[in-house]
């Protein structure tokens, strides 16, 4: 009898061990990884259509369900149904109130330097928990080069490096460059950034009880949204900061990818520097952002007249960065791109024929590279506005308004894709369904 019991126990132990091993292997394969120059998910190459949904991490904090939790769930269902499976989210804002002439988004994760309102991360918890139910992936940026969520300028303000007369007023471009460039040499600023990053990396989701570092819903951590050296004198400190933060993240989280959140040449004005910082062993993939309006690829509101030039320069910009990814043997993501509506209108009812054509061209790159197992591995259009609409008679966002995809300093409706933009969704859906269908067939 004892031999039979012992044999049964041994068999049971073997089965439990095998099941545990299988479960661990399945969990590991559900993380996005990089193999050679491709993303992999569940053992197959992962090419994707994604969206910038930065405010998705803030919706769960809204008191009104229609503007908050209900909206989040409805919009995630909508995105999934349209083939969008990858979302870029803000981790948390720094500071509150007016900065650089605008009211920043919030509530802040770090209201004052070194003080954290950890309940603000409940919003990110909810977004990740709901995304997991829909098999979606998140890219999370840990801070911001720009002021609309506080970002680097707020760290500098806390440490006395923003002159009194410049703390809230709208800065000139040269003033902003001069101020933000000091971040990389400001030791207390960087220490506060590191504390916030470490807090986020150490978080356990209150909804599904998963540690962030063990949650396969997260695809990647991003150092910041569009970190730039801003001035030549800051380049070496900037280079060290990128390497130090990428190493810090990898030391605390072995499961997730790391990227910088970079625009490309326009973020450094030096393609060699762009290549060098992305060559870092702790940086897993490259990104570029493409902004025809901001970079004056068309004049004023003359989008139709300048559209041929927009396409030409976009193709050239992608072509400029693709060889860098090829030399480094890493994936490249077109992480932001956008274009105004026809006639440069902010009205959600205005047509989007030029935007649709522009999206179709960029989406085609991902499809082509997916078919050829190439380096361009995904995209995130800027930006998803979902069910929100700009407030009538009001150009810019105000506290209490529903978030669209356009940050507070930009006209609401400028680059946002609303759920009502059916012609745009037709273009997005075709590629999104094609790529997600291909993954399903391979699994």
Language model region names:
Residues 7-17:
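Bacterial N-terminal signal peptides
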Residues 441-443:
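Short, solvent-exposed mixed-charge patches
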Residues 299-301:
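Acidic, serine/threonine/proline-rich low-complexity intrinsically disordered regions
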Residues 18-25:
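Boundary at the C-terminal end of the N-terminal hydrophobic targeting segment
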Residues 1-4:
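Positively charged n-region of N-terminal signal peptides that target proteins for export
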């Amino acid at each position: 009898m004892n031999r039979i019991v012992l044999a049964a126990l041994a068999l049971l132990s073997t089965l439990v061990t095998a099941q545990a091993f299988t479960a661990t292997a399945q969990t590991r394969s559900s993380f996005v990884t990089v193999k050679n120059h491709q993303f992999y998910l569940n053992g197959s190459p992962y090419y994707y259509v994604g969206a910038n949904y930065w405010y998705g991490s803030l919706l769960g904090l809204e008191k009104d369900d229609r503007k908050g939790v209900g909206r989040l769930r409805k919009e995630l269902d909508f995105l999934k149904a349209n083939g969008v499976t990858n979302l870029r989210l803000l981790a948390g804002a720094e500071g509150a109130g007016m900065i650089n002439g605008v009211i920043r988004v919030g509530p802040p994760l770090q209201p004052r330097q070194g003080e954290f309102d950890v309940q603000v991360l409940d919003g990110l918890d909810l977004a990740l928990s709901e995304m997991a139910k829909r098999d979606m992936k998140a890219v999370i940026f840990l801070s911001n080069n720009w002021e609309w969520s506080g970002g680097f300028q707020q760290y500098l303000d806390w440490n006395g490096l923003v002159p009194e007369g410049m703390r809230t007023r709208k800065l000139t471009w040269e003033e902003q460059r001069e101020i933000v460039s000091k971040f990389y040499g400001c030791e207390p600023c960087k220490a506060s950034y590191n504390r916030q990053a470490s807090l986020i990396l150490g978080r356990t989701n209150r909804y599904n009880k998963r540690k962030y570092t063990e949650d396969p819903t997260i695809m990647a951590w991003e150092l910041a949204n569009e970190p730039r050296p801003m001035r030549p004198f800051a380049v070496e400190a900037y280079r060290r900061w990128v390497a130090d933060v990428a190493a810090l993240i990898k030391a605390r989280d072995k499961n997730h990818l790391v990227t910088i959140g970079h625009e490309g040449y326009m973020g450094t004005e030096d393609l060699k520097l762009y290549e060098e910082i992305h060559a870092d062993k702790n940086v897993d993939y490259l990104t570029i952002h493409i902004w025809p309006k901001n970079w004056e690829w068309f004049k004023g509101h003359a989008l139709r007249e300048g559209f041929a030039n927009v396409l030409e320069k976009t193709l050239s910009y992608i072509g400029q960065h693709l060889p860098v990814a090829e030399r480094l043997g890493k994936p490249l993501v077109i992480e932001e791109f956008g274009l105004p509506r026809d006639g440069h209108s902010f009205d959600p009812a205005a047509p989007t024929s030029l935007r649709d054509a522009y999206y179709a061209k960029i989406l085609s790159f991902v499809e082509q590279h997916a078919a050829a197992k190439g380096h361009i591995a995904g995209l995130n259009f800027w930006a998803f506005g979902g069910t929100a609409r700009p407030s009538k008679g009001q150009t810019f966002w105000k506290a209490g308004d529903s978030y669209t995809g356009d940050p507070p300093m930009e006209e609401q409706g400028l680059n946002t894709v609303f759920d009502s933009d059916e012609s745009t969704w037709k273009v997005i859906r075709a590629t999104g369904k094609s790529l997600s269908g291909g993954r399903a067939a391979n699994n």
